[in-house]
């Protein structure tokens, strides 16, 4: 099954440099009527890493203009990854995943604002902290509503059974090979106070997604849901995950559609797809691997 053809997608943000480790992507999409928003991050090779988060807006889905941005120093961060945006009543919300300089752990914070162009990183409040959850890391949030409440899906890493000494020395516990990198769920009545519910999608016992499974979005599929996730088989593929499909009746329990390999994009090399987000009307944003190894942000539409 193919929801969209990544080769036919249109590049909308180029990477900041033309080499592996140079990325524009990790998008979080939000549509409100005719207004389309995408929040994404820019990244350079180490030691720069994810250095800027940007919100862009479009009225026609073709031209995207920057309405807000902030560099990682304003968050006291070593790196920024996937973020999410939502508009609730008269309040805009920006959820940011970042590594703090002081302890080098991935966590998720929330900033609220009356306007989409007025977020102040000084107002950030931590909503999911790995120290509180007994985890090595938590990052890459995205959302769905469930009744009057909220579901937040994240990437997370478990603490190693052998102990955590040195786990955060690189500022990225998920890139050490010492954690289980899986997809988890938190629930909230209001989008501010969150309760961790645990795993919803774990790596397979063997195969192409046995190292990482990062659920990235979900769309309606009849009476249930079709989910897209990033998978990898080893630490060597950590920054070149591929896109697989899973199904769910309730957003809480997921089953793989194809265990043999990725379902969207190439198996390896250029043309790889990761960090997909899809709006309710079918706007598709994704990070795409170019021939030079850099990643660009593309937009497409579901078939």
Name each model-derived stretch.
Residues 1-303:
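Carbohydrate-active catalytic/glycan-binding domains of CAZyme proteins
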